[in-house]
Amino acid sequence: VLAYDPQRRGQQREGGPMTVQSKAPAAGGGEPPEGRVGRRAGISAKTLRTDRWWIQPVVTFAVLFSFIIYSTWAAFIDRDYFSEPYISPFYSPCLAIKCGTVPGSKGVPHLGIFGHWWFTSPAIIILIVPLGFRMTCYYYRKAYYRSFWLSPPACAVAEPHAKYTGETRFPLIIQNIHRYFFYLGILLNLILTYDAVIAFRNHHGAWGHAGLGTLVLVLNAVFLWSYTASCHSCRSIIGGRLNHFSKHPVRYWMWGQVSRLNRYHMQIAWISLLWVAFSDVYVRLVASGTITDVRFF
């Protein structure tokens, strides 16, 4: 804080504007060369942070990497993903005729769009949508940029890359298709909601029944809808392209609700990611006969 000095103010008024030059020390110490005033000090340390800033990127890397390994295995194993009336979210909707011909999938409903010529797991077709939606998500981009690419690993921590081009070049410029995956994500959510509804049947197809698997699939649909609704693209679509909110009270109200949900987008992103994996695990254990579904009524 600078104290007010009336005499100094008078000197400034008589002699014209007062010029203050701050001479920062050069990178090697000592006074900077003449003509290079105001240069920042050279700091060789990677960061001046003293907290455990590395914990978050390490945990993020571990969780995302584990999910990638498991989801890849679950997609290619091509079995044990259906037990009436439960179907794994990794395999829904089943688009290939071969869906009902592998162990642990007898009787699974399929659309048959891909005929007998489809030789690999039908999950490969479906997982493109949730994978593309989450990979281009604004929060997940931040998460894996920091944890996998260290760009940067944390706030106020230097990154190892020599230059930064952002998302203006291939392949990162593809991130701009996030909004289109948003619409596909809504379609997939509708299908998974249908799976949750038909889970209120027993293995004979009679309605009015529920088990632990029903609760698992219902919560999976709720978490996925919450993740989609809290998405930044959803908030932009609802409240964007409006010059006056007062002329659109309904959209303004919807935008306000989505904005409140958007505050928890990070937490919802993790909950929905882990729960969809848990949903697959539960259905897989029931379909393989490892456990028996707990029936409520």
Question: Where are these predicted regions, by residue range?
Answer:
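Short, Lys/Arg-enriched N-terminal segments with co-localized hydrophobic residues
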Residues: 1-17
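Membrane-embedded alpha-helical bundles that constitute the cytochrome b-like, heme-associated redox core
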Residues: 4-5, 19-297
